[in-house]
């Protein structure tokens, strides 16, 4: 078994769309990013890549490569999974924590779990998504952006 941890953060900017966990969330702002800015899937991808000792999302999908401009993070996650499978691992379970003052994430968590389970080819019982605030402290508390942490367990296939 191998464990990986991932973290991502993006600042709000522009009109959107706001996509978190593969879900389009109604909100007046989007996140500034080279790809679609999905902090949840970016953190999760980093956790999975880290567990497999494959580097990180920036190494695999560099923001200097125009091929990834506006990229769908679900596609990036699936490509990372293919590379992990080539190393002989499968996903055991994943846990994602979204850190945002607004918008509220909890109503969207069930669909995020469905998306992640589908993309990783695992059961929903092996996917957890939760959200928290920083009690109005720091950049997320001031509503300047969204952060996310994720952990992943890989098992030898």
From Swiss-Prot:
The keyword Endoplasmic reticulum does not apply. 4-CDP-2-C-methyl-D-erythritol 2-phosphate binds at residues 8-10, 34-35, 56-58, 61-65, 100-106, 132-135, 139, 142. One of its GO terms (biological process) is isopentenyl diphosphate biosynthetic process, methylerythritol 4-phosphate pathway. GO terms for molecular function: 2-C-methyl-D-erythritol 2,4-cyclodiphosphate synthase activity; metal ion binding. Its EC number is 4.6.1.12. It catalyses: 4-CDP-2-C-methyl-D-erythritol 2-phosphate = 2-C-methyl-D-erythritol 2,4-cyclic diphosphate + CMP. It comes from the Bacteria. The record marks 34, 133 as: Transition state stabilizer. Belongs to the IspF family. NCBIfam families: ispF (TIGR00151). Homotrimer. This is 2-C-methyl-D-erythritol 2,4-cyclodiphosphate synthase. The lineage of its organism: Bacteria, Pseudomonadati, Pseudomonadota, Gammaproteobacteria, Enterobacterales. The gene is ispF.
